[in-house]
């Protein structure tokens, strides 16, 4: 496995650039990484990294001061004004890399009905649609039956309204129709109570703090949920009809509020 550490910067830092940049040492052809880069995300944050560090543990999602320094120093060669003070969060992911540095997209030779999509690194971002088509063919072959395309399938779903992006007139109409859209819960990202409830009522339920964050970005701003998390916990608990100490950050066992007896110590 190969771990990569990345950083997300405050939206204010996006004023430094509006494109994708990367520095690659062409003299090091044996390198297993381009060294990451700088890019503006769809939500207008700057994303730095990743680096590439071999790890024996496939679930090693730890970040290190050394890794963060490595990424920052490398990207400062492209943009000297980058500062650690702009970092709002950092994280790591692990890639199933191969020593051949090649994609492995094929039906398993040992496990029935198992399709492998491994060894996929940075190029996988652009290759994903083609990879999905190949895997679809492998799955159909594995089933061994003739499958017809559902012509009635509609891949377009109605999105959750983004209050912060609406013109004033449309926002006023939406709030008059449902006042919850006028209650701003996440100040950093301007996410309303109505948007959070929409996410909780979606076909694929996400009654966790991280689930709401990924659906509507509540908690993804500068304070990283420091202000809005308690309100989000309350909204989830009320909507789901559960106690606040049953609301999890990500999954069962990651509840964020303890309602047990006090031991008398702080």
What are these model-derived regions, one by one?
Residues 1-22, 73-76, 80:
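Central beta-strand plus flanking loop segment that forms part of the substrate or channel wall
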Residues 25-27, 32-35, 42-43, 54-184, ...:
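C-terminal catalytic lobe of FAD-dependent flavoproteins
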Residues 59, 192-203, 226-244:
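Iron-sulfur (Fe-S) cluster-binding segments and ferredoxin-like electron-carrier domains
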Residues 186-188, 223, 228:
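Short cysteine clusters
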Residues 241-266:
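Low-complexity, small/polar and acidic-rich linker and loop segments
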């Amino acid at each position: 496995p190969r771990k990569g550490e990345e950083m997300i910067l405050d939206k204010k830092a996006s004023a430094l650039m509006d494109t994708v940049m990367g520095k690659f040492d062409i003299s090091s052809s044996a390198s297993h990484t381009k060294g990451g880069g700088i890019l503006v995300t769809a939500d207008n944050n700057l994303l730095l990294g990743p680096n590439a560090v071999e790890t024996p543990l496939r679930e090693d999602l730890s970040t290190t001061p050394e890794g963060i320094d490595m990424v920052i120093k490398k990207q400062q060669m492209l943009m000297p004004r980058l500062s650690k003070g702009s970092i709002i969060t950092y994280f790591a992911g692990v890639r199933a890399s191969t020593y051949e540095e090649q994609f492995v997209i094929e039906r398993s030779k040992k496990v029935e009905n198992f399709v492998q999509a491994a060894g996929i690194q940075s190029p996988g971002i652009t290759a994903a649609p083609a990879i999905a088509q190949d895997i679809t063919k492998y799955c159909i072959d594995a089933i061994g039956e003739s499958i017809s395309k559902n012509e009635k399938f509609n891949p377009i779903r109605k999105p959750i309204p983004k209050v912060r992006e609406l013109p004033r007139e449309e926002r006023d109409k939406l709030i008059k129709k449902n006042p919850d859209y006028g209650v701003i819960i996440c100040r950093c990202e301007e996410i309303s109570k109505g948007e959070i409830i929409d996410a909780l009522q979606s076909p694929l339920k996400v009654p966790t703090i991280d689930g709401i964050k990924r659906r509507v970005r509540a908690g993804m701003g500068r304070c990283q949920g420091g202000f809005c998390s308690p309100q989000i916990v309350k909204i989830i608990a009320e909507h789901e009809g559960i106690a606040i100490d049953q609301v999890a950050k990500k999954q069962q066992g990651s509840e964020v509020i303890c309602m047990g007896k006090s031991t008398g110590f702080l």
